[in-house]
Amino acid sequence: MRIMGLDFGERTIGVAVSDAMLLTAQGVKTIRRSPKELEELKTMLQDYEVDHIVLGYPKNMNGTLGPRAQATEEFAQILKEEFGLPVTLWDERLSTMGAQRSLLEADVSRAKRKQVIDKMAAVFILQGYLDYIRQKNGQNKE
C-alpha cells in the first residue's frame, strides 16, 4: 500500500508518493495542468500501486476557505469518480513556504526552485499526513 500526495495548483500538480511502510514521502514529479493530467495520474497510481490519495486543501491562515478550496473540492470529486480511490483533503497551509525554505537552505538556484517547488509542496503535504496517521496509530517511536 502506498499513498499519493498532490499539491493541486492552477497551472501544475505536484506529486509525491509514500514508501511502502508509510514512513516517508518522496517527490515524484510536477505535472502541467492539461486535458491529459488524469491519464498521467492514472499511470502513476498504477506504477506506484497507490490505494489512497491525499490532496492538499488550501485554507486561509485564519482557517476560512477561499476560492481555491472550491476548485480543490471539485478536483477531489473528479479523482474519486475517475479512480475509485479514497481522497483525503489535507490542510496545506504553509506547505509551499516550507518547501521554499527547505530549497533555500539547500542552496537550490531560483530557476531550479521554480521547477521543483510544487513537487516539494506535495512532499510536505504527504509527509504531514503520514506523520499524523503514524501518531494517531501510536507508532511514533521518537
Swiss-Prot record:
EC number: 3.1.-.-
GO BP of this protein: rRNA 5'-end processing
CDD domains membership: YqgF
Entry GO terms, CC: cytosol
Keywords, in A-Z order: Cytoplasm, Hydrolase, Nuclease, Ribosome biogenesis
Pfam families: RuvX
GO molecular function, one term: nuclease activity
Protein name per Swiss-Prot or TrEMBL: Putative pre-16S rRNA nuclease
Localization in the cell: Cytoplasm
Gene3D superfamilies for this protein: YqgF/RNase H-like domain
Claim: Cytoplasm is one of the keywords in the record: yes
Enzyme class: hydrolase
Source organism: Desulfitobacterium hafniense (strain Y51)
Family to which this protein belongs: Belongs to the YqgF nuclease family.
